[in-house]
UniProtKB/Swiss-Prot annotation:
It comes from Conus villepinii (Villepin's cone). It is found in: Secreted. Disulfide bonds join C91-C111, C95-C107. Keywords: Cleavage on pair of basic residues, Disulfide bond, Ion channel impairing toxin, Neurotoxin, Potassium channel impairing toxin, Secreted, Signal, Toxin. Belongs to the conotoxin R superfamily. This is Conotoxin vil14.4. Residues 23-85 form a propeptide. One of its GO terms (molecular function) is toxin activity. Its main location: secreted. Residues 1-22 form the signal peptide. The cysteine framework is XIV (C-C-C-C).
Length: 112
């Protein structure tokens, strides 16, 4: 919402503020400083930027996204003794209560 308001303010500012305030004979003191083609191109670009933002497409000038560092799973040897014991117990529990029906020795072989 804030981005849209900012773009609307910029669009309104480009059409209202860029005036020269010196008087020349036969000319209005409020003649736009930008040529109409430049102002129209600027408004068109801002409108496209707003449309992309509304569609969820990333604008061309945004900063690259920050990548999260990959979280590496600890190897079994790097785990603490308590953590290893809990993992083995959990593995044994799921192995023995699972649908496949492994025996205790098969589960112990797989989990340790």
């Amino acid at each position: 919402m804030g981005f849209r308001v900012l773009v609307l303010v910029v669009m309104a500012t480009t059409s209202a503020l860029p005036f020269t305030f010196f008087e020349e004979p036969g000319r209005s003191p409020f003649r736009p400083a930008l040529r109409s083609e430049e102002a129209q191109a600027l408004r068109h670009g801002l409108t496209l930027l707003l449309a992309r933002r509304a569609d969820g497409q990333p604008p061309d000038m945004r900063q690259p996204e920050m990548r999260r560092p990959e979280v590496r799973q600890l190897e079994f040897a790097e785990l603490s003794v308590g953590q290893r014991r809990w993992d083995v117990d959990q593995c044994m529990y799921y192995c023995l209560t699972g649908v496949v029906g492994y025996s205790y020795t098969e589960c112990q072989t797989m989990c340790t």
